[in-house]
Amino acid sequence: MRAGRGTLGVCLASVKQSQGGDLDKLACGLKRRSEKRNPSPSDVPSWTDQPVADTHGKSRAMAAASSEMKRDQSKASLILHSGFKALQYLKESMGRNSTPAASLSMAVVLSSAPSEEHGAGVSGGIGDTLGSDWPAREPRTTDSCGQYLKGEAWVSGWQGHPKVREVGFLRGEPLSAVPKGLGTRSELSYCSELCQLPYTYPYYEALPEDKTRCVSLDHLSPVFSEETVEDEKTLSSTSDGLQIVMGLLALQSSRLTSL
């Protein structure tokens, strides 16, 4: 600094040289610039608007980097603004009554897919519990004697056996028609056939081999009661719901006695 070789000395020397050595003129220009917010370029020397280079010469690089960052920020803000506008438009379109059909259909598809899978699982569980021959189910395998193989539930495939299907409902009425193939539905409801099962299973092996003979309940005795006229009248006078409950109870008892 004393030798005039510092940064301040270099600046003063350059200013003095540009202004012809008149420092008072430079002070007057700076004063007018401070008084006026928008001074004319002629009043202020051009060197005041230029960044002063440091000892390492990094000012121009920093200025370029700063301008590049500003441009990137402006682009990012523009993208965010566009995305926000698109999101607002989507919310408004979903809130209006005139919602696009594509959005509704997509929402319905996404919401109905798990429901269909859940419903299929529930129906499959009901079919396995009742042992009914539901659609798309294959008949269970049996051995040569007609008995189900070890590990197979005997309830699961009883509906396809001809002897069981020939037995009439609680009053001994024969079936009006018997399907010819396995895996088909009977004309009777599943509840009616379920009530027949407790009566027929204890005599499953004793039934004759003639598949055309129609077996009546007069030749079979119920599992849970004696063969009397009073019991037959009681069964005939009860409602369908009570018959189903009694049939389910008999089904459990016959399954336990057969073990």
UniProtKB/Swiss-Prot annotation:
<keyword id="KW-0963">Cytoplasm</keyword>
<keyword id="KW-0968">Cytoplasmic vesicle</keyword>
<dbReference type="GO" id="GO:0097677">
    <property type="term" value="F:STAT family protein binding"/>
</dbReference>
<dbReference type="Pfam" id="PF15487">
    <property type="entry name" value="FAM220"/>
</dbReference>
<dbReference type="InterPro" id="IPR040355">
    <property type="entry name" value="FAM220A"/>
</dbReference>
<keyword id="KW-0539">Nucleus</keyword>
<dbReference type="GO" id="GO:0035556">
    <property type="term" value="P:intracellular signal transduction"/>
</dbReference>
<protein>
    <recommendedName>
        <fullName>Protein FAM220A</fullName>
    </recommendedName>
</protein>
<dbReference type="GO" id="GO:0005634">
    <property type="term" value="C:nucleus"/>
</dbReference>
<comment type="function">
    <text>Promotes dephosphorylation of transcriptional activator STAT3 by interacting with both STAT3 and protein phosphatase PTPN2. This promotes interaction of PTPN2 with STAT3 and mediates STAT3 dephosphorylation by PTPN2, leading to negative regulation of STAT3 transcriptional activator activity. May be required for spermiogenesis or sperm function.</text>
</comment>
<dbReference type="GO" id="GO:0001669">
    <property type="term" value="C:acrosomal vesicle"/>
</dbReference>
<dbReference type="InterPro" id="IPR029155">
    <property type="entry name" value="SIPAR"/>
</dbReference>
<dbReference type="GO" id="GO:0005737">
    <property type="term" value="C:cytoplasm"/>
</dbReference>
<feature type="region of interest" description="Disordered">
    <location>
        <begin position="29"/>
        <end position="66"/>
    </location>
</feature>
<comment type="subunit">
    <text>Interacts with transcriptional activator STAT3; the interaction occurs in both the nucleus and the cytoplasm, is enhanced by IL6 and promotes STAT3 dephosphorylation, leading to negative regulation of STAT3 transcriptional activator activity. Can interact with both unphosphorylated and phosphorylated STAT3 but interacts preferentially with phosphorylated STAT3 in the nucleus. Interacts with protein phosphatase PTPN2/TC45; this promotes interaction of PTPN2 with STAT3, leading to dephosphorylation of STAT3 by PTPN2.</text>
</comment>
<feature type="compositionally biased region" description="Polar residues">
    <location>
        <begin position="39"/>
        <end position="49"/>
    </location>
</feature>
<dbReference type="GO" id="GO:0000122">
    <property type="term" value="P:negative regulation of transcription by RNA polymerase II"/>
</dbReference>
